[in-house]
Design a protein with these regions (language model features):
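GST-like domain detector, emphasizing the conserved glutathione-binding G-site
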Residues: 1-121
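GST-like fold's C-terminal all-alpha helical module
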Residues: 97-183, 188
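Exported/periplasmic ABC-transporter solute-binding proteins
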Residues: 191-192
Length: 195
């Protein structure tokens, strides 16, 4: 069984959403984390070496960091069809989308939430991301292909925190609406006490 060390309204929320989409059996262990506003703090119940989330235990194996957790979980549940498997012709594209989300897009979202000024490099990255997501959504209802995938979930989870991070784009607004209607997300909201 998978154990998710969960701090409500944090990066672990997206892992909870992924677990729900996968139909996985899991246990939630609530933990406290240091919040950007200075509240909270390290929790001895959290095995993450930096006392952060996300963090899971899967059959006794500690896995930290969103990208590693994403690849591990989506690969562990191939029947959910949320990711192309090893050897699939779109595998590299899938992993590239995930890397772009965690290494480029997430820092932009964090900076936007903090109200930090945008430099030229960040603006170029934001423009590239907006163009790439819009182009993908011009082809399909979802980012990677014609059905929901783990790629949609990671980008959607970031845009739920900062919906204007890429500017107003009709394709992205419609895509976010489709995601907001997913039953797995409704279950996550209920678990976290949100509607």
């Amino acid at each position: 069984m998978i154990t998710l060390f969960n701090a409500t309204m944090s990066r672990s929320t997206r892992v909870l959403w992924l677990l729900e989409e996968l139909g996985a059996d899991y246990e939630l262990v609530p933990v406290s984390i240091r919040r950007p506003d200075g509240s909270g703090g390290a929790d001895p119940a959290n095995p993450h070496p930096l006392a952060q989330v996300p963090c899971i235990l899967d059959d006794g194996e500690l896995i930290v960091e969103s990208l590693a957790i994403w690849v591990h979980l989506a690969d562990s549940f191939p029947e959910a069809r949320l990711a192309p498997g090893l050897g699939h012709p779109r595998r590299a594209e899938y992993v590239g989308w995930l890397g772009l989300a965690t290494c480029v897009f997430e820092p932009l979202v964090i900076a936007a939430l903090a109200g930090a000024p945008t430099d030229e490099r960040q603006q170029a990255a934001r423009s590239y991301l907006a163009q790439r997501l819009s182009a993908a959504l011009d082809r399909h209802d979802w980012l990677l292909w014609d059905r929901f995938s783990a790629v949609d979930l990671i980008y959607g989870s970031l845009l739920r925190f900062a919906p204007d991070a890429l500017g107003p784009l009709p394709q992205i607004d419609a895509w976010l609406y489709r995601m907001s209607e997913r039953p797995a997300l409704a279950r996550v909201r209920q678990q976290e006490g949100r509607t």
